[in-house]
Regions:
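Short cysteine clusters
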Residues: 51, 71-74
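Short linker/helix segments within small regulatory modules
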Residues: 61-67, 86-90
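N-terminal pre-ligand scaffold of iron-sulfur
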Residues: 1-64, 97-111
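Short Fe-S-cluster ligation motifs
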Residues: 77-111
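Intrinsically disordered, low-complexity segments enriched in small/polar residues
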Residues: 12, 74-76
Length: 111
């Protein structure tokens, strides 16, 4: 990943102002794009709003005990580390880096 090609977009001033659902997933706006923000073991990660398989809304899914994102539509599982489908179907979930800084929470979008 070449950090020169990342454009950082502020999505919140503080983590506490992010409206996480009971499933530890929130929807935020990063440069006009709906992005899911997940929270697992104290870390934040960003991933696509829709599942690449059939367009299920991932904000309505959940994060399992080992940190995979689960689509509510067909239960496809995606790694929060690399976006790979761990269910074996070969799909890839777009994901972006997240940084907690003194001046806010930022999602890095690749150009």
């Amino acid at each position: 990943m070449d950090s020169k090609n990342i454009h950082w977009h502020k999505v919140a001033d503080y983590e506490e102002e992010i409206n996480f659902s009971d499933n530890n997933i929130a929807v935020v706006n990063a440069n006009g794009k709906q992005v899911c923000l997940g929270k697992y073991n104290g870390s934040l990660f960003a991933f696509a709003y829709k599942c690449p398989h059939a367009g299920g809304i991932l904000a309505e899914g959940w994060i399992d005990a080992i940190g995979n994102i689960i689509c509510p539509q067909h239960r496809y599982k995606y790694s929060i580390i690399n976006g790979r489908n761990v269910s074996g179907e070969g799909y890839y979930l777009t994901h972006w880096p997240v940084e907690k800084r003194d001046d806010g929470i930022f999602v890095g979008v690749f150009s």
